[in-house]
Amino acid sequence: MSKREDIHKVLIIGSGPIIIGQACEFDYSGTQACKALKKLGYEIVLVNSNPATIMTDPETADVTYIEPLNVDRIEEIIKKERPDALLPNLGGQSGLNLCSELNEKGILDKYGVQVIGVQVDAIERGEDRIEFKKTMDSLGIEMARSEVAYSVDEALAIADELGYPVVLRPAYTMGGAGGGLVYNKEELSTVCARGLQASLVGQVLVEESILGWE
C-alpha cells in the first residue's frame, strides 16, 4: 500500500453500538485500518460513540473521541483536529450516512476534508433510491416498476397504480430497516410511516412485487 503525501491526518468514524447488521466486524476492520494507517505514518483521529470496543483502545488511534455520532459533534471534531481526510466506510451505515450529511451541509468543503475509501457520489447512488434508479437505467439494467414517495399519501397513490402487493424500500437505512412487503392499504400506511421515519432523507421507494416470478 503506497502512502499519499497529500494526506497527514485521517478521521475515522466508528460504527457506534453493536446492533444487528452492524456488529463486531466493523470494530475489527476499523481497528485493522487504524493499525495499517498508523504504520504508514498517518495521524489517526477516531470518533466512536461506543467505548466498549477494541477500536477505542487508547493505543489504536492517536486521538480518540467517545462522542455521539451526529453531524454537529463531528463538525466540532473536524474544526478542532483539522483532518486532511475522512474514512467513513468502516463505520457501517452510520458512517456512510454521516459522510453524506457532512457533504450535503458543505462541512467537508468548508474544512477542506477529502473523503477516502469510498466516493460520496457512490454512497448516494447506492443509498438514494432515485439515484440508484438513474444508475440502473443508464446501464440498461431492467428493474421492477417503482416510484419514490415522501409521504404515506404519495405511497398509497403509487401502490394503487402498481397494484398490491408492493415492496417498500426506505433510503439510507441499514439492511432495509423500516421496509417490507405489504398487501393492502392498512399495511402500507403502517410500514410506510415507519420507513419514512427510519430514512435519513424521508424517502421510500414503492416497488411492484415480483413474488413468485422465475
Locations of regions flagged by a protein language model:
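N-terminal beta-alpha lobe that positions the nucleotide/phosphoryl donor
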Residues: M1-E214
